[in-house]
Amino acid sequence: MDIFAEITPRTKSDSGQDLWVFGKRPLLALLIILTPFLKGCQETQQPSSSNYPKILCTTQMIAEPVRKLLPPEFQVEHLMGSGVDPHLYKPTPEDLRKILRADLVLYHGHHLEGRMSDMLSQLEASSPGTKVVAICEKIPQEQLIIDPSGVIDPHLWLDVTLWKDVCAQLKMTLTKHGDLSPVELEARYNTLIQELDQLHQAVLTALNPIPLERRVLVTAHDAFAYF
């Protein structure tokens, strides 16, 4: 795919110079162009005060278990705040800087992040210093909900049991990054799984009194199939 194919001169300025108009993939093109420059700026102008890797998550759903798995010394950020629709999210220039400065970028995948997913999936090839992982794509597809057209439902966190599998993948990924004690990581993981088990039991306790014939959920978005 030629990412520059849609960056073309469309019109002329008053002085007769070409005015360049960006098409569908401007952020990806700019990201690839600016990667070496921004990485260099980071190294020369912003020396790190910590030897711990910088971990960037697209959503709070991923960031929360990552923070529980890691000691507080680790730098964990997420891009999208509460109430943001990840399908429609458009990264800002500051987001792009954070992505390029991160040692590890974690995102859902399965196009939950919309067109941002395409940018992230190609980032690793253009910026070898940044590791990018679509964490939910590591779950076997036979465990996922797939509609007749072959589209995968990406809202895995609404099934607590399935989200435990995602957390296991997070643990495996984090094991490969940073100076982290395997014993401490395993202990934190076990605590996280206990919390998720308690949450799952609380959900069952809340739903069990509802008769099967009355378990109907009316929602404005098709995000609750796993629930």
Please state what every model-predicted region is:
Residues P26-K39:
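Bacterial N-terminal signal peptides
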Residues F37-F227:
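Extracytoplasmic metal-acquisition and chelation regions
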Residues F4-L27:
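Bacterial N-terminal signal peptides that target proteins for export
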Residues Q17-L19, L31-I32, R115:
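Enrichment for repetitive, rod-forming helical segments
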